[in-house]
Amino acid sequence: YIADMHFGHENVIRFDDRPFADTEQMDEALIQNWNERVTADDSVYVLGDAFWKNEENSIRIMQRLQGHKHLIQGNHDRVKGKLRPYWESIEQYAEVNDENRLVILSHYPILFYKNQHYGAVMLYGHVHNTREWELVEKWKKEQWAMGIPSRLINVGCMMAYMNYTPRTLDELLEANPQPMIKRIRKDGTNAGENSNGEL
């Protein structure tokens, strides 16, 4: 899983403070990282904003990327024309079974998602590592504090745990551990405490 690679997008280097001198260096690093992790038999879900405008350059890059490539369309993705056949699927939203775990895929964060209370994971992009991402994280913490599981994970390539590389679900969950749920009783005490107020 990965999002927001923005191949060929000069401005995103400054926007994300990416460690690349130019788009050529960024594109080559993204391709190398991808191919070091992805085999010809692997499936990779790109959660939007894969490329920036130049169709011919995008095709050249797609030809170099290993694996079965699936696009969850983002606001910058163009899915018509010559690039379309290089994607095995193109969806606005998807639900996949990853080793018997339900994973919800969208370019945009969905705060209330299917089977949230039953362990489903929601992967998203779009917000990069901006104030919007911080707001999603704040909301997640508030949900966990109320005993509501909220496993939203930003798979934008610029996130430290992504390091411009596609990641497995296990890697994402390890890098984004769930906090301990503290259920609050109607009387205001923590359900994890004993009568002495100790955990």
PLM segments and residue spans:
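A short, conserved beta-to-alpha structural element at the edge of catalytic cores
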Residues: D22-R37, G67-R84, R151-P177
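Conserved beta-sheet core of the metallophosphoesterase superfamily
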Residues: P85-R183, D187-G188
